[in-house]
Amino acid sequence: MKKYIVVTGASSGIGAATAKAFARRGENLIVIARRAELLENLRGEIANISPDSDVIVKPCDLSRSENVLALWDDLKSYELKALINNAGFGDFGFMGNHDIQKMVKMIDLNVTALAILSSLFVRDYKCKQTQ
């Protein structure tokens, strides 16, 4: 069975760069982010870098905990090698000017989703050989 490295926040920035770096090493990837079209673009770039790497695209808004749990259920059908828990965003500026709903979404993504995915990965893979 193929083993995959999961990269969240893979549509741009550090996440996309990380996915490409693993592709250069011949790894199979599951790339996750909200923006499906950017993930598809990334899949195309990776195909040029490493044609033998299998890249699975999973669009998902991880700021919603029900999506995080559904995603993990979906990922159970794959053998995972590593989780790069990179999804997140910031809202900069004077705290008194922050939009409260945006702040809640940021905490849900940066803290809640990260904690849930990390916990589930450790729970399900702590006794498995991932190499």
Model-derived regions: residue spans:
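Active-site loop of short-chain dehydrogenase/reductase
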Residues: 3, 79-80, 125-131
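Conserved glycine-rich cofactor-binding loop
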Residues: 11-13
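Conserved glycine-rich Rossmann-like NAD(P)H-binding loop of the short-chain dehydrogenase/reductase
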Residues: 25-42
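The beta1-alpha1 cofactor-binding region of Rossmann-like NAD(H)/NADP(H)-dependent oxidoreductases
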Residues: 59-70, 100
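Hydrophobic positions on the long internal alpha-helix
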Residues: 84, 117-121
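Conserved NAD(P)H cofactor-binding loop of Rossmann-fold oxidoreductase domains
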Residues: 86-91
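Substrate-binding pocket helix/loop in short-chain dehydrogenase/reductase
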Residues: 94-95, 99-107
